[in-house]
Amino acid sequence: MLKAKIIAPDFLKGEIEKSLINDFSLYNREGLTIFPSFCDVHVHLREPGFSYKETIKSGTMAGARGGFTSVLSMPNLNPVPDTVENLNVQLGIIKETAKINVYPYASITVGQKGEKLTDIKSLSKLAVAFSDDGRGVQDDKMMEDAMLLAKENGKMIVAHCEVNALLNGGYIHDGEYAKKNGHRGICSESEYAQVARDLELVKKTGVSYHVCHVSTKESVALIRQAKKDGVDVTCETGPHYLILSDKDLQENGRFKMNPPLRSEEDKNALIEGIVDGTIEMIATDHAPHSAEEKSKGLEKSAFGVVGLETSLSACYTHLVKTGIITLEKLIELMAINPRIRFNLPFENAFTAFDLNESYKVNPKDFISMGKATPFEGMEFYGTCYLTALNGKAVYEK
């Protein structure tokens, strides 16, 4: 008999209930809410090349603790997965050490340098999609050619949209806080100008296209209009962009990520985008760094914060408990839409949370090697008790 509450679309409910009752009866109890496991399309696992920041093992264990059983790993690695040989290095480590499913991106350009396209055809057999995340592809013709090749090979282009010429050495949003505290700002146009360019190229090429970490109101408006025009575009935003703005900034590296926390107006536009379906998924852009790299204040710290272990509870507390969206909608954003869009299987997997149990975010508790989060010290509702994959616990509290 079912005692826990299952929140899942009908096509997944039966499988989840069966696995819960047969394999994990201990978690079939009142007070627990069971979800299909989550899928994060934007994660930096740092291995190979930067395993002092995170490893595939530590990153996937952190994912499991957050309720995830699928993550898509970004290509800013060493070696960059820009050839089949290099991608196989990462796939080998995934096979040996990953605790959950990891689907790697291949890079759009060789070495992510933006100078020459990778062999998209040969990489298409192994890569989930193509991205140069961490930087935008600056050359219009190169991006157009990449889109044509991706379309030819049935793959998606996943874009970090940023015009380098507009960055001017900025490192936080070009808003009130930057002006008041003498910081160099990153203007919103550096993002939305490239979103606009890419959407024109998508119309021209017909490629499937996805925008990473949308942070500005203008980007949301452009994507909303493109969808109305029938363009094959989806996008994601991160929990921190939906919950915080530049008015929450402190002089601390844990508030530094790219794109930066924008204005309150931008934050509200992102929430509106989530509500009306313009933004179909929430992705963490989990980007771990060493303590030293994050200890140098806003100006000098590395860009990037972690997010896998707080994503559900952060969004549940600030979007669901506040009545902005339903719990069902949050599960669509975190578990259903990402898999559908990226054509990934719905695993035999689920996660169990106590949504009434609150906790104070303490990075010391994180499994991830990265400890920098703008949510440190905040109180969130929703504690993960179990994440199950193929009848086995990949995380238990």
Residue ranges and their predicted role:
Residues 1-27:
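N-terminal metal-binding scaffold of metallo-dependent hydrolase/deaminase domains
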Residues 31, 42, 63, 67, ...:
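Divalent metal-coordination and catalytic microenvironments
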Residues 297-300, 321, 348-397:
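C-terminal cap of metal-dependent C-N hydrolases
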